[in-house]
């Protein structure tokens, strides 16, 4: 997928395995994987961090192939899903960091410009999540309250 605010074409991407069945060497059952997901979520890890740990430490390449559901759906069914979607959370965190940098370095014009780009991505993503009903319709990003969202 191409980059939004950069000249790169972004051609590299991960290749999913052709076979969607569970590997024969994997000894974990669906319930074991779900228990691992719940345990890691209670530690405060994000869904992507949970996926990386399951892949690297437990040999679960794709949780969806083993359990039949994605990690976020499993967390939602148990009520452990994060309030903000992960990509939106990281954009807000980045905007807070740039704004903090701008408080110390007022004349940094490039950072000011990059902050505008980051905040436009936040608004665009928030609009998408409102239409998908992930965020409530009255949710609004405000730079003054953003640091409280990511703290």
UniProtKB/Swiss-Prot annotation:
Pfam family, one: Ribosomal_S13_N
Entry keywords, A to Z: Acetylation, Cytoplasm, Isopeptide bond, Nucleus, Phosphoprotein, Ribonucleoprotein, Ribosomal protein, Ubl conjugation
Modified residues (N6-acetyllysine): 27
Metal-binding listed as a keyword: no
Disulfide bond residue pairs: none
GO function term, MF aspect, one: small ribosomal subunit rRNA binding
UniProt PTM: Ubiquitinated at Lys-27 by RNF14 and RNF25 in response to ribosome collisions (ribosome stalling).
GO biological process: ribosomal small subunit biogenesis; translation
GO cellular component: cytosolic small ribosomal subunit; nucleolus; small-subunit processome
Principal localisation: cytoplasm
Compartments, record wording: Cytoplasm; Nucleus, Nucleolus
UniProt cross-link Glycyl lysine isopeptide (Lys-Gly) (interchain with G-Cter in ubiquitin), position: 27
Crosslink feature (Glycyl lysine isopeptide (Lys-Gly) (interchain with G-Cter in SUMO2)) location: 43
NCBIfam families named in the record: PRK08561.1
Subunit structure: Component of the small ribosomal subunit. Part of the small subunit (SSU) processome, composed of more than 70 proteins and the RNA chaperone small nucleolar RNA (snoRNA) U3.
Cited function: Component of the small ribosomal subunit. The ribosome is a large ribonucleoprotein complex responsible for the synthesis of proteins in the cell. Part of the small subunit (SSU) processome, first precursor of the small eukaryotic ribosomal subunit. During the assembly of the SSU processome in the nucleolus, many ribosome biogenesis factors, an RNA chaperone and ribosomal proteins associate with the nascent pre-rRNA and work in concert to generate RNA folding, modifications, rearrangements and cleavage as well as targeted degradation of pre-ribosomal RNA by the RNA exosome.
HAMAP family: Ribosomal_uS15_A
Protein name: Small ribosomal subunit protein uS15
Species assigned in the record: Cricetulus griseus (Chinese hamster)
């Amino acid at each position: 997928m191409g980059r939004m605010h950069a000249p790169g074409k972004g051609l590299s991407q991960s290749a999913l395995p052709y076979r969607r069945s569970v590997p024969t060497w994997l000894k974990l059952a669906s319930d074991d994987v779900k228990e691992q997901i719940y345990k890691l979520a209670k530690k405060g890890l994000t869904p992507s961090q949970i996926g990386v740990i399951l892949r690297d430490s437990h040999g679960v390449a794709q949780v969806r192939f083993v359990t039949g559901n994605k990690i976020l759906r499993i967390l939602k069914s148990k009520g452990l899903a994060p309030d903000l979607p992960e990509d939106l959370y990281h954009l807000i965190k980045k905007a807070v960091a740039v704004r903090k940098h701008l408080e110390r370095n007022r004349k940094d014009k490039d950072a000011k410009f990059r902050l505008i780009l980051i905040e436009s991505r936040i608004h665009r993503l928030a609009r998408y999540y409102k239409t998908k009903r992930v965020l409530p319709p009255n949710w609004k990003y405000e730079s003054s309250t953003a640091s409280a969202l990511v703290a």
